[in-house]
C-alpha cells in the first residue's frame, strides 16, 4: 500500500540537522536557485589591472592580509575549494562561498553564507554592519553586494580591495565562473550595498 507524505515530513525524518538547515533556506527561497545562491556574475571579461590605482580608503580599519589572500585566488575557475569547504558536494553558484572562505581563512568564523539575499545581507544588517550604495567609509575586506537586475534582491557578492575616490575595486568569485579583480563607479546602480567588516 502506498502512502503519501508531504516532503517536509520526509525531510525531518531523513536529513541531518545541517541538511535540514539548508533545506529550510531552500524552502524560504521557493527553490529559486538565483535567490538561494546568488546568480554570480555573467561577466566574461578579464581581470582588471591595479597598476597605478591610488587607493584613498576611509577611516575604518580594514584587513589588507585578507585582500592579499583574496587576490591570490584570481584565476581560479569553477570555485573549488570554496563551495566544497562550505559543505556542498558539487559546484553551486559560489560567489558567497568564496567570500565566506576568505573570511574564514582570515580568522573570522562569521559571517558564513552561501546565499547573498537570504543569508549574507541579513547577517550584516542584523549586526548593524550594513552600508547602502553611496556609503563612503569603505575598508579593505568589506563585502560588496550587487543587484544586477535591479529587483531589490542581492544577486552577487565580492570583497572590497579599496576605492580611489570614484571607483570601488573588488575581488569576486564566480565572475564568469572565475575569481577576478573588477571595478565599478561608486554610484553604479547595481551596487546594493556593503557588508562592513569589523577587524
What are these regions (language model features)?
Residues 78-140, 151:
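Catalytic cysteine-centered active-site loop
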Residues 41-108:
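N-terminal capping segments
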Residues 1-42:
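Charge-rich (acidic/polar
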Residues 2, 6, 10, 21, ...:
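Extracytoplasmic/secreted proteins, especially bacterial periplasmic and envelope-associated proteins
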Residues 42-54, 131-133, 150, 154-199:
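Aromatic- and glycine-rich peptidoglycan recognition patches
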Amino acid at each position: 500500500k502506498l502512502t503519501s507524505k508531504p516532503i517536509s515530513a520526509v525531510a525531518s525524518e531523513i536529513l541531518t540537522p545541517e541538511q535540514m538547515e539548508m533545506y529550510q533556506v531552500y524552502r524560504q527561497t521557493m527553490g529559486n536557485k538565483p535567490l538561494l545562491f546568488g546568480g554570480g556574475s555573467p561577466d566574461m571579461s578579464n581581470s582588471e589591472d591595479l597598476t597605478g590605482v591610488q587607493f584613498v580608503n576611509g577611516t575604518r580599519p580594514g584587513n589588507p592580509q585578507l585582500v592579499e589572500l583574496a587576490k591570490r585566488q584570481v584565476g581560479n575557475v569553477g570555485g573549488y575549494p570554496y563551495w566544497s569547504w562550505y559543505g556542498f558536494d558539487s559546484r553551486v553558484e559560489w560567489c558567497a562561498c568564496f567570500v565566506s572562505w576568505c573570511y574564514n581563512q582570515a580568522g573570522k568564523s562569521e559571517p558564513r553564507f552561501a546565499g547573498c539575499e537570504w543569508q549574507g545581507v541579513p547577517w550584516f544588517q542584523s549586526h548593524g554592519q550594513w552600508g547602502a550604495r553611496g556609503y563612503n567609509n569603505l575598508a579593505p575586506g568589506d563585502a560588496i553586494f550587487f543587484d544586477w537586475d535591479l529587483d531589490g534582491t542581492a544577486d552577487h557578492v565580492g570583497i572590497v580591495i579599496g576605492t580611489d575616490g570614484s571607483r570601488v575595486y573588488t575581488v569576486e568569485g564566480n565572475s564568469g565562473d572565475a575569481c577576478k579583480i573588477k571595478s565599478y563607479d561608486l554610484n553604479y546602480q547595481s551596487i546594493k550595498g556593503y557588508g562592513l567588516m569589523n577587524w
